[in-house]
Amino acid sequence: RGENYSANVTYFDVDWDGIIIQVTPGCGWRYNFNGGKAETSGWEVDFTYAINDELSVDFAGSSMTAETSIDITSLGASAGDRLPNTVESQWNLGLVYDTTIFSYPSYARLDVNYYGDSFNTFAENPASSSPDYTKLNFNLGVDLNDNSKLQISIDNLTDERTEAYIYAVDDTSWRPRNWMQWIPPRTVSLKYTFDF
């Protein structure tokens, strides 16, 4: 920690025994499976830095590996394979500008969010996964007085159209297993807060 910055770094290394993992087979129904032993390790980092009295930047992110420590024949997994439904990296970078609007204390914040990919099974099949994606968010806040605040938020500022979840697998079921879920489109919200 310094005069205009702060930083935190955490390393973790966990040996799991009797871990429960969630599996999504071709039928579409999820179930929990006794995964036996697994290892997870990685880093978590966050920092803030005040560039000047009005402008500051902050970052928070993590990077990890999560692997089975044993062979799981029934699921086609070998020791060292990535665990299903685990995200190996994600981060957020934010830029904040403090100012005044019509003499009211205000701020504007722009965030870049990155979400890493994950897979439903040990096979890491892209047709049954959550792909990685990046999106922008924007917030503008105004302190009207000591008790009330007004905030406008724009989620997915650039209206990015990308897949959040893909499920397209071969199966003997009579019902097609071929669909996709998108991340939410640009969404604008207005929030008024009053403290009493």
Task: Label the predicted regions.
Residues I20, L55, E67, R161-T162:
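Activation segment
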Residues N4-N8, D13-D15, F33-F122:
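Gram-negative outer-membrane beta-barrel transporters
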Residues T10, A123-S130, L136-G141, S148:
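Short, glycine/charged-rich beta-strand-loop motifs at protein surfaces that mediate ligand recognition
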Residues G2-N4, N52-E54, E88-Q90, I101-P105, ...:
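Strand-connecting loop/turn motifs
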Residues D17, V23-Y31, I70-D81, N125-S130, ...:
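Flexible, surface-exposed loop regions and adjacent strand-edge segments
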Residues N113-T121, V142-F196:
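C-terminal beta-signal and adjacent terminal beta-strands/loops
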Residues Q90-Y97, L136-L140, L190:
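Feature captures outer-membrane beta-barrel proteins of Gram-negative bacteria and organelles
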